[in-house]
């Protein structure tokens, strides 16, 4: 009897190790695929929502106003994505003071994002729907072999070039890193008289 339990435990532990290794491999494959600084940011127009109000978001139009912080996240209302949305909401005024627009993108339908933009984004910044995954594909931000976007953040300069890219499953450094990249960009701009 005890031998059978040990065999089941060993089999279960082996299966868990295999899943953990595969997950690590998949995450590392998705992490290396993102577009790099200096690359041209693919233009897109999509449905977005701010404070529960749907609108059409155009990257080209947003870049006319300044840099864009484009961040991809796996799914609305999941723990890491909620933490990341709260952190971006808290930092939105700092991004705006630097002339930057923040937009989050996931594969969620716009109805889900209407609620997410109110409760988790706290009416501070827009989130966009990439239900057909064409935007995340163009930015190499699909989490390999899953139906989700990877957690990838970009800072895009007004000229459409990628200034900064960061991919990590943890939401911890996305806001701080993109804010630092926007601050660095702003410091390099000629001062108006």
Roles of regions detected by a PLM:
Residues 45-67:
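A short beta-strand-turn-helix
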Residues 82-121, 133-135:
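Structural microenvironment flanking redox-active thiols in thiol-disulfide oxidoreductases
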Residues 59-86:
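Short active-site neighborhood of thiol/selenol oxidoreductases, capturing the structured segment around
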Residues 2-20:
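Bacterial N-terminal signal peptides that target proteins for export
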Residues 149-193:
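Thiol-/selenol-based redox modules, centered on thioredoxin-like
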Residues 42, 67, 150-152:
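Short loop/turn microsegments at loop-to-beta-strand junctions
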Residues 32-40:
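Cleaved targeting-peptide boundary
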Residues 28-30:
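N-terminal signal peptide c-region/cleavage motif recognized by signal peptidases
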């Amino acid at each position: 009897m005890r031998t059978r339990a040990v065999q089941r435990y060993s089999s279960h532990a082996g299966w868990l190790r295999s899943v953990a290794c595969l997950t690590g491999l998949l995450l590392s494959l998705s992490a290396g695929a993102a577009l790099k600084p200096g690359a041209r940011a693919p233009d897109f127009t999509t449905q977005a929502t701010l404070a529960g109000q749907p609108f059409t978001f155009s990257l080209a139009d947003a870049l006319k106003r300044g840099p864009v912080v484009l961040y991809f996240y796996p799914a609305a209302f999941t723990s890491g994505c909620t933490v990341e949305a709260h952190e971006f909401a808290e930092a939105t005024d700092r991004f705006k003071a630097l002339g930057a627009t923040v937009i989050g993108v996931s594969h969620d339908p716009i109805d889900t994002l209407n609620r997410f933009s109110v409760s988790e984004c706290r009416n501070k910044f827009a989130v966009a729907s990439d239900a057909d995954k064409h935007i995340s594909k163009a930015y190499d931000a699909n989490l390999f072999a899953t139906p989700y976007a990877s957690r990838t953040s970009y800072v895009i300069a007004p000229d459409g070039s990628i200034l900064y890219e960061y991919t990590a499953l943890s939401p911890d450094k996305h806001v701080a890193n993109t804010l630092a990249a926007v601050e660095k960009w702003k410091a390099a701009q000629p001062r108006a008289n």
